[in-house]
UniProtKB/Swiss-Prot annotation:
Keywords: Ribonucleoprotein, Ribosomal protein
Originating organism: Chlorobium limicola (strain DSM 245 / NBRC 103803 / 6330)
The gene coding this protein: rpmH
Gene Ontology BP terms: translation
Pfam families: Ribosomal_L34
Record protein name field: Large ribosomal subunit protein bL34
């Protein structure tokens, strides 16, 4: 039987990335709360080296 987690960077960025967070009101609220907490990584697409991809 196939496992449930089949990692894909493209799907990861599209589902949890910065653009998706900015596209909805609740997503912007998530970013605001992560900024307020002082997170260095706001979203999965803001990781080191992947910001331009």
């Amino acid at each position: 039987m196939k496992r449930t987690f089949q990692p894909s960077n493209r799907k990861r960025r599209n589902k949890h990335g910065f653009r998706l967070r900015m596209s909805t009101k609740n997503g912007r609220r998530v970013l605001a709360s992560r900024r307020a907490k002082g997170r260095h990584r706001l979203t999965v697409s803001c990781e080191m080296g992947t910001a331009t991809k």
